[in-house]
Amino acid sequence: MNSLPDGYRALVVGSSGAIGSALVRALQADPRCAQVHALHRGSTPALELTDEAGMAAAAAHVAQSGPLHLVLCATGTLHVDGRAPEKRLAELDPAAMARAFAINTIGPALVIKHFHPLLAR
């Protein structure tokens, strides 16, 4: 993090999980970090990876604090809708696979789409 300026502002998406919360704590402990935005499904504003309108609203809220210097996405899921990963081809469920893809692939892409414009140039 030596390349970040003094007084940098950071965003952690997925801040309620083990990795995300550890990142938030590390950033809050850095005296050079002026502000940490920690977003997740239960935060205010809430951020749900499959809700693009909500993500846009969260980005607008974060933008009010000024430009970001660091955006970290610590999201992802292995168990979707209570289903464990498949161990046999017969267990494949297209709907569960589509939901996992939306959360693990499209969601982070939407984070980039909405929060990249907030990065300091």
Predicted regions and their residues:
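Catalytic Tyr-X3-Lys loop
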Residues: A90-A109
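Amphipathic alpha-helical dimer-interface segment in Rossmann-like NAD(P)H-dependent oxidoreductases
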Residues: A63, I103-R121
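Conserved NAD(P)H cofactor-binding loop of Rossmann-fold oxidoreductase domains
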Residues: L72-P85
